[in-house]
Amino acid sequence: MEILNQFSQFSPNMEAQGASSIPQPSQDAHEKARQQAENQETAKNGMISQILDQAAMQRLSNLAVAKPEKAQMVEAALINMARRGQLSGKMTDDGLKALMERVSAQTQKATSVKFDRRRNELDSDEELDL
């Protein structure tokens, strides 16, 4: 009976409305999320500019253009190092190079080519082709 009462509460116009009756996230929520992401990006860039010297910043910018994923990993490593107190003063270009090499070594996938030569039962080494 309770289910029937719930169905009777729907008006016939609700079917015609279709998807418009489903609550949609407001534009304010999207704007708020975008603003929050922008604020986080600004804070991250501010921290990185305090961590790196000019030459290292230029190198990181070049890396971000060429390989954005790797640049994000290096930025995350820099921020973690700064939060842990592992950095003393601004990191130089040489220090950033070393960090980039460590990140590359950790993420480098070993690629190998493997030849699988399977022999047919029809083709035997014992037979001679004449």
Swiss-Prot record:
<feature type="coiled-coil region">
    <location>
        <begin position="27"/>
        <end position="51"/>
    </location>
</feature>
<feature type="region of interest" description="Disordered">
    <location>
        <begin position="103"/>
        <end position="130"/>
    </location>
</feature>
<dbReference type="InterPro" id="IPR002836">
    <property type="entry name" value="PDCD5-like"/>
</dbReference>
<keyword id="KW-0175">Coiled coil</keyword>
<protein>
    <recommendedName>
        <fullName>Uncharacterized protein D2005.3</fullName>
    </recommendedName>
</protein>
<dbReference type="GO" id="GO:0005634">
    <property type="term" value="C:nucleus"/>
</dbReference>
<dbReference type="GO" id="GO:0003677">
    <property type="term" value="F:DNA binding"/>
</dbReference>
<comment type="similarity">
    <text>Belongs to the PDCD5 family.</text>
</comment>
<dbReference type="InterPro" id="IPR036883">
    <property type="entry name" value="PDCD5-like_sf"/>
</dbReference>
<dbReference type="Pfam" id="PF01984">
    <property type="entry name" value="dsDNA_bind"/>
</dbReference>
<feature type="region of interest" description="Disordered">
    <location>
        <begin position="1"/>
        <end position="46"/>
    </location>
</feature>
<feature type="compositionally biased region" description="Polar residues">
    <location>
        <begin position="36"/>
        <end position="46"/>
    </location>
</feature>
<feature type="compositionally biased region" description="Polar residues">
    <location>
        <begin position="1"/>
        <end position="27"/>
    </location>
</feature>
<dbReference type="GO" id="GO:0005829">
    <property type="term" value="C:cytosol"/>
</dbReference>
